[in-house]
Swiss-Prot record:
Keywords: Ribonucleoprotein, Ribosomal protein. PANTHER family: 50S RIBOSOMAL PROTEIN L28, LARGE RIBOSOMAL SUBUNIT PROTEIN BL28A. The gene is rpmB. It comes from the Bacteria. SUPFAM superfamilies: L28p-like (SSF143800). One of its GO terms (molecular function) is structural constituent of ribosome. The keyword Transferase does not apply. One of its GO terms (biological process) is translation. This is Large ribosomal subunit protein bL28. Belongs to the bacterial ribosomal protein bL28 family. The lineage of its organism: Bacteria, Bacillati, Actinomycetota, Actinomycetes, Streptosporangiales. GO terms for cellular component: ribonucleoprotein complex; ribosome.
Amino acid sequence: MASVCDICSKGPGFGNRISHSHRRTRRRWNPNIQTVRTRVGGTPKRLNVCTSCIKAGKVDRF
């Protein structure tokens, strides 16, 4: 599944995973992306949307 929101273009965030001995390895935080059916220009379409856009009401689900 895509890890980018089609509405706000939110993508993954990057940082370090730090162990107990303080060694660092790279990791990523993926946004919570859901597949939502909505109407775009009157035609039904599936979009990959983050949950913050769904909560904000930026997409109409049906």
